[in-house]
Amino acid sequence: MSVMFDPQAAIYPFPPKPTPLNDDEKQFYREKIKRLLKERNAVMVAHYYTDPEIQQLAEETGGCISDSLEMARFGTKHAASTLLVAGVRFMGETAKILSPEKTILMPTLAAECSLDLGCPIDEFSAFCDAHPDRTVVVYANTSAAVKARADWVVTSSIAVELIEHLDSLGEKIIWAPDRHLGNYVQKQTGADVLCWQGACIVHDEFKTQALTRLKKIYPDAALLVHPESPQSIVEMADAVGSTSQLIKAAKTLPHRQLIVATDRGIFYKMQQAVPEKELLEAPTAGEGATCRSCAHCPWMAMNGLKAIAEGLEQGGAAHEIQVDAALREGALLPLNRMLDFAATLRA
């Protein structure tokens, strides 16, 4: 049974939208970034949710575009002494925890995540202390401090398999922070899961009414859904999965049209995988909204070309990720458990 804990609702201070660059400015910063990457012995590690021009640059410079799990793997294996992480702050922290000898730079340290912000360590630690009989499993979208409080870290790509494993051992689970992903995992496994009440501000906004209207316009389209979405959206899906799993589903499904319910940043790599198919954004906004779909993380959008160039050029406190040594030691154990478990699934 999944029991829901309801912390005080958080209000997130969204960042301002980056100032658009003209074509000449974009080219200037692209060339500058390429030069700085070579000078700093650096490589770009970009998430699927960053803007297309950022993902393209990562490709052109031998970097990585992936989900959170593969980002974690890539950074540990690459020979570069500096990682430029284009994503949100927890991704940079994870890179530093796993590769402490490397310099970890980000375009901005102000790139937050609503799941991270919605799971403050003091409240979460008290929640865990109130349920000492439960194994603590936290999503990768959390701070280093929350990871250090956990027994396991997990990404959406292996969440179901891990909870199945723990359930087979008779363990009861605390799951944090995403309530929708926690509910999905519980329903898939039947495990005893006690959920924290966090949510992703992007996926939480997908609406069944608007999606039903879109399905009527495109009746032959398949619906691909990330499990951070509400249960009502997941129940409508033809395929449910992590970012990497949705790209695989796009390739295997026979449908020529695909409605995609996740951050629209994924369209860059998904369209590469299925150039012959039409990709449609799942609607998030209600009547009167100014966008057809608002499905793009405002913090991911902070990873612009100018900010990346500044991060590589300036470094320092405004761009370099630091993790307290004690926190790093505490967070490393559950992260390594995740990587070891993921390796057994691939074996």
From Swiss-Prot:
GO terms for cellular component: cytosol. Iminosuccinate binds at residues 47, 68, 139-141, 156, 226-228, 243. Binds 1 [4Fe-4S] cluster per subunit. Coiled coil: none annotated. Its main location: cytoplasm. Keywords: 4Fe-4S, Cytoplasm, Iron, Iron-sulfur, Metal-binding, Pyridine nucleotide biosynthesis, Transferase. This is Quinolinate synthase.
